[in-house]
């Protein structure tokens, strides 16, 4: 993880620059003015990863400037990280400095927290973890009131749980999420909640079905499922699928069918190119899909998946890379038009931005 340049005094100007960049990217498609959802200026990031750097005989939290992996920036705190992470950082450092079992060949620390106050710490080592480590880790987890995961090559030891629990409110309803260690979660919880609210409103109340690609742990699935008759959701990561199934059950959402397929495989299934055993018992022809929701990786949708979305009246698209979003819109622009768009400032003080668009059939 690279160290961002943190300067709250520049926040508004940076956000205005991102807004202008998004307007320019979407200008060829006659998109409306984007709705802008800002971020807290500090303590917004719910996860953080630090290398450990030895100096003066002690290990320090360290990050690196972009493009420079050799000159560490030593840290005592991290203002963009959640208050919980900042509270844990000095206490964890004191613990490893007082314990050879915890510090020996420790090279990386990852924090995962939630708006609900839950926390998990992952400690990565260049050595096998033994009983002495386990005893020290159990004591530390109790003292810090966290779960701990110890990792070394071929080894993963869990003290407590291997996930954190989050609560997000959408349209007055609170949704509970399990967020597994090592799986993708939105880093900016406050902005994530705004994204969920925007997507919920943009989709609207429907009496037909929704197809969701790249559903992850069900982050969007839970609130969007309350807007439609049924949802067919796909995800390729087994860890994320298991988390999504648990989240659906925990929230009493029972109108979602979840299948472990890639977007490309689902395209083949819908086009009847080939059958998939993982779709056994699911009658694809029974669905009356009116909308598709996509939240693809930075590369965007591949051309075949993009063509698949063309079949739908409404395409609700969340993008972590507006450049590939624009390329996908260009492919769809002869049949669909952008009727709503939004900028979500997930990553303050960086050039990265998250965008959302609603495309509707012309």
Swiss-Prot record:
This protein's name: tRNA/tmRNA (uracil-C(5))-methyltransferase
Naturally occurring in which organism (per UniProt): Ectopseudomonas mendocina (strain ymp) (Pseudomonas mendocina)
Gene Ontology biological process terms in this record: tRNA methylation
Residues involved in S-adenosyl-L-methionine binding: 186, 214, 219, 235, 295
EC class of the enzyme, as a word: transferase
Designated gene of the protein: trmA
UniProt entry keywords in alphabetical sequence: Methyltransferase, S-adenosyl-L-methionine, Transferase, tRNA processing
Family of this protein: Belongs to the class I-like SAM-binding methyltransferase superfamily. RNA M5U methyltransferase family. TrmA subfamily.
Reaction(s) catalysed (UniProt annotation): uridine(54) in tRNA + S-adenosyl-L-methionine = 5-methyluridine(54) in tRNA + S-adenosyl-L-homocysteine + H(+); uridine(341) in tmRNA + S-adenosyl-L-methionine = 5-methyluridine(341) in tmRNA + S-adenosyl-L-homocysteine + H(+)
Pfam family, one: tRNA_U5-meth_tr
Source taxon at top rank: Bacteria
Active-site residue numbers: 320 (nucleophile), 354 (proton acceptor)
Keyword ATP-binding on entry: no
E.C. code: 2.1.1.-, 2.1.1.35
SUPFAM superfamilies: S-adenosyl-L-methionine-dependent methyltransferases
InterPro entries in the cross-refs: MeTrfase_TrmA_AS (IPR030390), MeTrfase_TrmA_CS (IPR030391), SAM-dependent_MTases_sf (IPR029063), TrmA_MeTrfase (IPR011869), U5_MeTrfase_fam (IPR010280)
GO MF annotations in UniProt: rRNA binding; tRNA (uracil(54)-C5)-methyltransferase activity, S-adenosyl methionine-dependent; tRNA binding
Functional description taken from the UniProt entry: Dual-specificity methyltransferase that catalyzes the formation of 5-methyluridine at position 54 (m5U54) in all tRNAs, and that of position 341 (m5U341) in tmRNA (transfer-mRNA).
One cellular-component annotation, GO: cytosol
Record-linked NCBIfam families: trmA_only
């Amino acid at each position: 993880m690279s160290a961002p340049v943190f300067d709250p005094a520049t926040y508004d100007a940076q956000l205005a620059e991102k807004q202008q960049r998004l307007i320019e990217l979407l200008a060829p498609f006659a998109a409306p003015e984007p709705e802008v959802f800002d971020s807290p200026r500090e303590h917004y990031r719910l996860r953080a990863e630090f290398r450990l750097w030895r100096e003066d005989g002690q290990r320090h939290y360290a990050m690196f400037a972009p493009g420079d992996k050799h000159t560490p920036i030593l840290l005592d705190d991290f203002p963009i990280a959640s208050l919980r992470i900042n509270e844990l950082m000095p206490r964890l450092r004191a613990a490893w400095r007082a314990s050879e079992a915890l510090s020996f060949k420790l090279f990386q620390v990852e924090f995962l927290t939630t708006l609900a106050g839950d926390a998990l710490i992952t400690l990565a080592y260049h050595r096998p973890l033994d009983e002495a480590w386990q005893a020290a880790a159990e004591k530390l987890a109790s003292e810090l009131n966290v779960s701990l995961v110890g990792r070394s090559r071929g080894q993963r030891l869990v003290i407590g749980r291997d996930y954190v629990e989050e609560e997000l409110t959408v349209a007055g309803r609170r949704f509970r999420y399990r967020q597994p260690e090592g799986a993708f979660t939105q880093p900016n919880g406050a902005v994530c909640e705004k994204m969920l609210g925007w997507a919920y409103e943009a989709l609207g109340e429907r009496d037909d079905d929704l197809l969701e690609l790249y559903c992850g742990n069900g982050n969007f699935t839970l609130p969007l499922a309350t807007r439609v008759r049924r949802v067919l959701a796909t995800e390729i990561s087994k860890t994320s699928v298991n988390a999504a199934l648990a989240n659906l059950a925990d929230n009493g959402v029972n109108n979602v069918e979840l299948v472990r397929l890639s977007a490309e495989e689902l395209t083949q299934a819908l086009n009847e190119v080939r059958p998939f055993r993982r779709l056994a018992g699911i009658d694809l022809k029974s669905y009356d899909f009116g909308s598709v929701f996509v939240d693809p990786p930075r590369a965007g949708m591949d051309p075949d998946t993009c063509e698949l979305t063309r079949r739908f009246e409404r395409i609700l698209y969340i993008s972590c890379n507006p450049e590939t979003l624009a390329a996908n819109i260009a492919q769809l622009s002869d049949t669909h038009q952008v009727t709503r768009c939004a900028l979500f400032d997930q990553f303050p003080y960086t050039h990265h931005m998250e965008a959302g668009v609603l495309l509707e059939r012309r």
